[in-house]
């Protein structure tokens, strides 16, 4: 059964060079920051776009300020479930019932668990959380 919660996703840009991600990971470890999600993509202008969901928002904000990352923040929905056939479809049906548009969705399955990060208009977050959690 899916469990959904609201999370803050931070987005920032780094240079796209060998070792930059490792350096960031080492700094995060030194600051004792745990990430629930990390996504990185190269851009055409020798930069990379990073998106992450930290376990503790305030701690990451302090880190980002000291590291001069200048992140933007957005509220996303993090859905986690044990793999049961049809959970993905049920979540999408819930989104459709509310006539909410998904701006982006990312998914990963590991060790019989599946997780999704759903980005949608902020006005839909609370109703989607309620509907996803009540549908189970």
Where are the language model's segments positioned?
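A conserved regulatory-domain signal marking ACT and ACT-like small-molecule sensing domains
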Residues: 1-136
């Amino acid at each position: 059964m899916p469990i959904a919660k609201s999370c803050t996703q931070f987005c920032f840009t780094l240079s796209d060079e060998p070792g930059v991600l490792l350096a960031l990971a080492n700094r995060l470890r030194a600051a004792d920051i745990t990430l629930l999600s990390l996504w990185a993509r190269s851009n055409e202008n020798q930069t990379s776009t990073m998106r992450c969901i930290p376990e503790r928002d305030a701690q990451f904000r302090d880190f980002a300020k000291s590291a001069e990352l200048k992140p933007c923040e957005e509220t996303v929905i993090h859905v986690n479930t044990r793999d049961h056939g049809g959970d993905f479809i049920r979540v999408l049906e819930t989104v459709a019932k509310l006539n909410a548009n998904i701006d982006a969705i990312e998914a990963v399955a590991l060790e019989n668990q599946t997780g999704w990060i759903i980005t949608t208009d902020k006005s839909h977050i609370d109703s989607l959380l309620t509907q996803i959690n009540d549908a189970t």
